[in-house]
Amino acid sequence: MKKLLWASAAVALLAGCAGLPQTSRTAAIHEIKFEANLVPADLTVRVGDEIRWVNHRTLPVLIDIPGLNAEMLSCDRGFSNMFGTARELTELDPSKSVSLCFSKPIVISYNARMRSADPGGMKIEPGTIRVVAPPQ
């Protein structure tokens, strides 16, 4: 019975992975850090590079990327819901990271919403990511 259960689990896993899209990831990883400020606020990467946001703060950070959708992505960790739909807004807990890879050249503007001692209790910092085509 256990062998049948293991075999069924293996078949289900393989069938589930068969439908995953091919990625065009490169080996390059670019970190955007949340510390006292967003660093770097402006970043230029190539198609397929991984952009990784890392929260070094003691409070969660909200990352808001208006217009984000699955068609523009070649990888996604932390920006999609349990159904695989890309979310424009994601919360990043302290000492955690999320990442995206873009599948085509695009300019992305986003906001980082960080809780702070500033009046209003929220510090909003804009960021820009320029995704350029790989060299020919």
Describe the role of every protein-language-model region.
Residues L59-L68:
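Short, Lys/Arg- and Gly-enriched loop/turn segments at beta-strand edges
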Residues N69-R77:
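Short aromatic-acidic-glycine turn motif
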Residues V54-R57:
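Asparagine-centered strand-capping/turn motif at beta-strand->loop junctions
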